């Protein structure tokens, strides 16, 4: 910008002051109700896989790094990663590479205190397990498997499933589900992580089986205060069998959770408000985070949800459905 010298000119001085004033990033509160727009399906499973599902996504160096579960025609589970890509429109052309180990329902994040990447998942050598790496884009660069959690839950046909891990300044927390109307939590000192949460846990939410089913995710809300400092989403099964997400909020990761957008008619994300036309199910996924670290921070001004959906004309066993990725963007 060019400035003209004008003695005593308040206009030129004002412009100069404005030019030197840094812009302040606006902070948004979580909405009380949600309305989204949706992409179409963003990628198709490569040959040999029938579904891409259970997504975890981080943005590092301006690119999305996505890990996911896969299923085949027999309903067997595996896992994969996409080649890193910068825009959602590039996901269809990104490479799809099977992991050399099964990392089903994965959670990927950068553990900042020890400068290491962590990939947590289920159905390994313990109830939940993890591996570490210096480069999450190198599928062959992960460490040997270590125990993340060794506990067992009762009243569940699946045992503990669909973990997520998040940290605050002092502790790391493990949240998980069991397809049984309960959400569970375990914790440990952040100084002891990466490591095992052991076998102890507590039930933090309890209700009808279909209302608290699976796919729990927990996030720090950027700029959040009081009871909306943390956001939890949980996958539910609706009255007609379609999957949707309910949301809960809390003032601390170790505290109590309060229902926010928690009905099928007014969900966090579902058929009622997704804007999606290619799927009637909004299922297991991950909100796009501000940064890749253990705080799992999301920006309520720019919420996006990477989710799994499927053609409404497809039916049958859940594990045989042709799940594909899509992205919801919150309408402002």
Curated annotation (Swiss-Prot):
<feature type="glycosylation site" description="N-linked (GlcNAc...) asparagine">
    <location>
        <position position="313"/>
    </location>
</feature>
<keyword id="KW-0624">Polysaccharide degradation</keyword>
<protein>
    <recommendedName>
        <fullName>Probable alpha-L-arabinofuranosidase axhA</fullName>
        <ecNumber>3.2.1.55</ecNumber>
    </recommendedName>
</protein>
<comment type="similarity">
    <text>Belongs to the glycosyl hydrolase 62 family.</text>
</comment>
<keyword id="KW-0326">Glycosidase</keyword>
<dbReference type="GO" id="GO:0046373">
    <property type="term" value="P:L-arabinose metabolic process"/>
</dbReference>
<keyword id="KW-0119">Carbohydrate metabolism</keyword>
<dbReference type="InterPro" id="IPR023296">
    <property type="entry name" value="Glyco_hydro_beta-prop_sf"/>
</dbReference>
<keyword id="KW-0858">Xylan degradation</keyword>
<keyword id="KW-0732">Signal</keyword>
<dbReference type="InterPro" id="IPR005193">
    <property type="entry name" value="GH62_arabinosidase"/>
</dbReference>
<keyword id="KW-0964">Secreted</keyword>
<dbReference type="GO" id="GO:0045493">
    <property type="term" value="P:xylan catabolic process"/>
</dbReference>
<dbReference type="GO" id="GO:0005576">
    <property type="term" value="C:extracellular region"/>
</dbReference>
<comment type="function">
    <text>Alpha-L-arabinofuranosidase involved in the hydrolysis of xylan, a major structural heterogeneous polysaccharide found in plant biomass representing the second most abundant polysaccharide in the biosphere, after cellulose. Releases L-arabinose from arabinoxylan.</text>
</comment>
<dbReference type="Pfam" id="PF03664">
    <property type="entry name" value="Glyco_hydro_62"/>
</dbReference>
<keyword id="KW-0325">Glycoprotein</keyword>
<keyword id="KW-0378">Hydrolase</keyword>
<dbReference type="GO" id="GO:0046556">
    <property type="term" value="F:alpha-L-arabinofuranosidase activity"/>
</dbReference>
<feature type="signal peptide">
    <location>
        <begin position="1"/>
        <end position="26"/>
    </location>
</feature>
């Amino acid at each position: 910008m060019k400035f003209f010298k004008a003695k005593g000119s308040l206009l030129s001085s004002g412009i100069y002051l404005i030019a030197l004033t840094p812009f302040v990033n606006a902070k948004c509160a979580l909405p009380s109700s949600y309305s989204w727009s949706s992409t179409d399906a963003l990628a198709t499973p490569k040959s040999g896989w029938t579904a891409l599902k259970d997504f975890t996504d981080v943005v590092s160096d301006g690119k999305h790094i996505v890990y996911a579960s896969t299923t085949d025609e027999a309903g067997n589970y595996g896992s994969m990663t996409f080649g890193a890509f910068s825009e959602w429109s590039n996901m269809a052309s990104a490479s799809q590479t099977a992991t050399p180990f099964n990392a089903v329902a994965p959670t990927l994040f950068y553990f900042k205190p020890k400068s290491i990447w962590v990939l947590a998942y289920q159905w390994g050598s313990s109830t939940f397990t993890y591996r570490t790496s210096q480069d999450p884009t190198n599928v062959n660069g992960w460490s040997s498997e270590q125990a993340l959690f060794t506990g067992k839950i009762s009243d569940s046909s699946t045992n503990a499933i669909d973990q997520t891990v998040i940290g605050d300044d002092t502790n790391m927390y493990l949240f998980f589900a069991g397809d049984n109307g309960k959400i569970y939590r375990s914790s440990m000192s952040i100084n002891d992580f990466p490591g095992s949460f052991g076998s102890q846990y507590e039930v933090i939410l309890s209700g009808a089986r279909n209302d608290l089913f699976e796919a729990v995710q927990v996030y720090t809300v950027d700029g959040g205060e009081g009871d909306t400092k943390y956001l939890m989403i949980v996958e539910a099964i609706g009255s007609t069998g379609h999957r949707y997400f309910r949301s809960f909020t809390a003032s601390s990761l170790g505290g109590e959770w309060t229902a926010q957008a928690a009905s099928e008619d007014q969900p966090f994300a579902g058929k009622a408000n997704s804007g999606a036309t290619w799927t009637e199910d909004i299922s297991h996924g991950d909100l796009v985070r501000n940064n890749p670290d253990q705080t799992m921070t999301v920006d309520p001004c720019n919420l996006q949800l990477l989710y799994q959906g499927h053609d409404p004309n497809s039916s049958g066993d859940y594990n045989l459905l042709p799940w594909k990725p899509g992205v919801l963007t919150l309408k402002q």
